[in-house]
Structure formats: structure tokens, C-alpha cells
């Protein structure tokens, strides 16, 4: 039996054991007169990191825990155990039941509705075995770093390169009679190097990630791209304070959309801590703008057959023609808002932002003409309650659709409400490595504070 086949057989055997553990825990809680939900996630993996062509770290992981929530009427108790023996599971259930007796009643607590459960969960092909040993992982990390160090003489140091390989089992069950599980895999290779001269150093990184090992970009691609990004940042200039159009590069643009996701999530809404309160069915983005959620795309990083409450995930239009179609609610926040769960316990699943411009970043730069291309943001200056947005940024100054020079040490500021409404275009240079898949986004105007 090949190593990959062997590890798959072991994982499948482990899956059956974990299913039995979950069933046992649910059964114990039910016998005690409670309703319950139980989740187990077990992850095993290998991480190898290297720096300056020497191995720094080899790490094997094998982590897992069973978490149980019990509901006695309107009272809830939680407990967890990493020991999955029958006696340990019994102790965890008893602990959760004991805690429930002392918690305040909450009429919104409890399992998600039975008719929302994923009793027939689709196989999304999230598990792909690969024969990766320490030697292979080391070779990939070293190759990526070497490619970066050799790409340009201005690259003078390294933060290192690392390869990660992880496989996992997720099992979820509850007293509605739901019991589902799936296997998953994830592989990634990353590199970060430093360029420039003393007192004027810049660093950047590049990575590739996939559920399938053979779909990763090559180590050469990772290393050379990493070096290219660093070199392009060398000798940045500062800008004077001004108000100009701004392009958020695709992997930074995902952040803008994630702030939007936070603002329409049930937790923010029922606490009245969102700048998009009472905006369901209203225009929040330009009329050409649409976001679809597709949780069942095969082999994708953010695909999932059910959320962390066992609710089946399904295709949804989040925004259509700029109009907000849905909030993102769990069973708890849904009850608080008088709505049904949308299957978003645990986050969002494959958001696809529809581009309205072909030709990638080049076409978007041309459309902007003169302005700022943001390639990096830093700091915590985002307030979901008020929509205030103010973050440190770096990127490139653009004139006549052409990049002129790198810029750094600037602050960009605006209101998220305005930033969303003032989007002019989304390019088709889609970032596929995130749960939000969007191209670069052009905004009408933002305030830039510099010198």
C-alpha cells in the first residue's frame, strides 16, 4: 500500500471512531434529558520551515478535541475534551450538564431548526491525499527560498520559506438525529525575503495554497514572485495629503468585502453595532455590483456542506444589483432578529464578487488614470459600528494608467458606507486563495494623508 493510500485508510478508520464518539456523547446527553450538539475536529500535519538555505523547524501536529454543548430548556452548558475515551467523554457530558444548571436562561439558545439540518451532505471532494515526507517538504521550502534569493542581486536577506501539509476529519452530530462527517486536506508553500540597502529595507511575501498538492504553484513561481514584489517596493516615496481615486489590489480588496460581511452578520446586527443596520433590501453598493455565495464548489478552500451548527449550506445571492439580499445569521442571532439561520455559523463560504471590467489590473489602472494603487494595509483602524476607516498603507503612485513609483508611510481614510457605494469597477484578476474571491477594486476617491 502506498503511503498516501495508507494515510487515507487510517483517516477513514479515524472518521468512524470519531463518529462513534460523537454519537455516544449525544446519546448520554439525551438520556439525561438534554438536547445536545457535538463536534470533533482532528488535524494531523507536517510543517517544515527553512531560512537562508538551512532547515529551521520540522513540526508534526496531531491535534483534536471533542466539544459538546447541552441545552436544558433555555440553559446552556459547554465542555470539551481532547481525550476521546468513553470515560473522558462521559465526564465532559456531565460537566456540560452541570454548567447548564448554573447559566442564566436565554430564550434564543438551543439547536438550530431540524428542517435546516444537512441530513444529506454532499461530498465536495475536499480531501486529496499526497505522499509528502520531510525530505520532500524541505526540498520545496529550500527551492522557493533559493529562487527568491537568486532572482535579483538587491535581495539581501530572508525571513524564510515554509511548506505545510495538513489533513483533517470533521464530525458533527446533534439530537435531531444528524450525524455528518468529511475529510479535508490543505497544502501550502510560502516565502518571504528582504531587499534593499541598510536603513532602506523592504520585505514582502508570496504563497500558494490548495486542497490538492499538485495544484500548488511551483516553488520557482513562489520565490521569483516574492522577490519581484520586494524589488518593486524599493525606495518608496511619501505623498503629500490629497484626495484621489484608489485601487485596492485583489488580495487587499478581499479585506474591504470582509468588513462588509462583518457589518451584515447577525451578531453585529442584533447588538446594533453595525453601520448597515436596517439595510436589508436596500441599495448598499452600485447597481452593477453583485456577490454570490457558492458553498458547494468542489475542492475549494472555503467550501463546506454544513455550517458549525449542522445547518446545510446553500447557494445564495448576497448582493444583487447593489441591493443587500440577506443578512448572515446563525440560529442564535437569527432568533434575536426574528429570522431563520442562513447557515453562517463559522463564517462565509466562497463569496464570488462579479467583475464588471475585463483586462485585469492593467485595464483598471487605465480606467483610474491618476491615483493610488494600494498593495498593503496595516493597523486596526476599522470601526464596523460607525463605518470609520483609517489604515496605514503602502503601494504605488499611478499616472496616466502607468505605475510611476512605490509609496509608503501614508494613511488612507474614508467611511465604509461611501467606499462601498463609490466603487467604480471590479477587475477580472480574481484572487482565488481567499474565502472572498474578488478582483482588484477601483474606488472613486479617498483621503490620503502623507507628509
Swiss-Prot record:
GO terms under biological process: proteolysis
Any GO molecular function: metallopeptidase activity
One Pfam assignment: PmbA_TldD_1st
EC number(s) given by UniProt: 3.4.-.-
Subcellular location(s) per record: Cytoplasm
Keywords from the named record: Cytoplasm, Hydrolase, Metalloprotease, Protease
One Gene Ontology cellular component annotation held by this UniProt entry: cytosol
Protease is among the record's keywords: yes
Ranges in coiled-coil conformation: none
Leading EC class: hydrolase
Record PANTHER family: METALLOPROTEASE PMBA (PTHR43421:SF1)
Family note: Belongs to the peptidase U62 family.
Function: Probable metalloprotease.
Protein name: Metalloprotease PmbA homolog
Lineage: Bacteria, Pseudomonadati, Pseudomonadota, Gammaproteobacteria, Pasteurellales
Record gene name: pmbA
Amino acid at each position: 500500500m502506498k503511503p498516501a493510500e495508507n494515510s487515507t485508510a487510517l483517516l477513514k478508520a479515524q472518521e468512524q471512531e470519531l463518529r462513534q464518539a460523537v454519537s455516544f456523547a449525544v446519546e448520554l446527553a439525551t438520556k439525561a434529558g438534554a438536547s445536545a450538539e457535538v463536534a470533533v475536529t482532528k488535524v494531523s500535519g507536517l510543517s517544515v520551515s527553512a531560512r537562508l538555505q538551512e532547515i529551521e523547524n520540522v513540526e508534526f501536529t496531531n491535534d483534536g478535541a471533542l466539544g459538546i454543548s447541552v441545552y436544558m430548556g433555555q440553559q446552556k452548558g459547554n465542555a470539551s475534551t481532547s481525550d476521546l475515551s468513553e470515560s473522558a467523554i462521559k465526564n465532559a457530558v456531565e460537566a456540560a450538564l452541570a454548567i447548564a444548571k448554573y447559566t442564566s436562561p436565554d430564550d434564543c439558545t438551543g439547536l438550530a431548526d431540524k428542517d435546516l439540518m444537512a441530513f444529506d451532505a454532499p461530498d465536495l471532494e475536499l480531501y486529496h491525499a499526497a505522499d509528502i515526507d520531510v525530505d520532500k517538504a524541505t526540498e520545496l521550502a529550500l527551492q522557493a527560498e533559493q529562487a527568491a534569493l537568486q532572482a535579483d542581486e538587491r535581495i539581501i536577506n530572508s525571513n524564510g520559506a515554509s511548506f505545510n501539509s495538513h489533513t483533517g476529519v470533521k464530525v458533527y452530530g446533534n439530537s435531531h438525529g444528524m450525524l455528518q462527517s468529511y475529510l479535508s486536506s490543505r497544502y501550502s508553500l510560502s516565502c518571504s525575503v528582504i531587499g534593499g540597502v541598510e536603513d532602506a529595507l523592504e520585505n514582502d511575501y508570496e504563497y500558494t495554497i490548495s486542497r490538492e498538492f499538485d495544484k500548488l504553484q511551483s516553488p520557482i513561481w513562489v520565490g521569483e514572485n516574492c522577490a519581484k514584489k520586494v524589488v518593486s517596493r524599493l525606495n518608496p516615496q511619501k505623498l503629500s495629503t490629497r484626495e484621489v481615486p484608489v485601487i485596492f489590489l485583489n488580495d487587499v480588496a478581499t479585506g474591504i468585502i470582509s468588513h462588509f460581511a462583518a457589518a451584515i452578520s447577525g451578531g453585529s446586527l442584533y447588538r446594533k453595532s453595525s453601520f448597515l443596520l436596517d439595510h436589508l433590501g436596500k441599495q448598499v453598493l452600485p447597481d452593477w455590483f453583485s456577490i454570490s455565495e457558492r458553498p458547494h464548489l468542489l475542492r475549494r478552500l472555503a467550501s463546506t456542506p454544513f455550517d458549525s451548527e449542522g445547518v446545510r449550506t446553500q447557494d445564495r445571492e448576497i448582493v444583487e444589483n447593489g441591493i443587500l439580499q440577506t443578512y448572515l445569521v446563525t440560529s442564535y442571532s437569527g432568533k434575536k432578529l426574528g429570522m431563520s439561520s442562513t447557515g453562517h455559523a463559522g463564517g462565509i463560504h466562497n463569496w464570488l464578487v462579479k467583475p464588471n471590467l475585463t483586462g485585469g489590473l492593467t485595464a483598471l489602472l487605465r480606467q483610474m488614470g491618476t491615483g493610488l494603487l494600494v498593495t498593503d494595509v496595516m493597523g486596526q483602524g476599522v470601526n464596523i459600528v460607525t463605518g470609520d476607516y483609517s489604515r496605514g498603507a503602502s503601494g504605488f503612485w499611478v499616472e496616466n494608467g502607468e505605475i510611476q513609483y512605490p509609496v509608503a508611510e501614508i494613511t488612507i481614510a474614508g467611511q465604509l458606507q461611501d467606499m462601498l457605494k463609490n466603487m467604480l469597477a471590479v477587475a477580472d484578476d480574481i484572487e482565488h486563495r481567499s474565502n472572498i474571491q474578488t478582483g482588484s477594486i477601483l474606488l472613486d476617491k479617498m483621503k490620503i494623508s502623507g507628509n
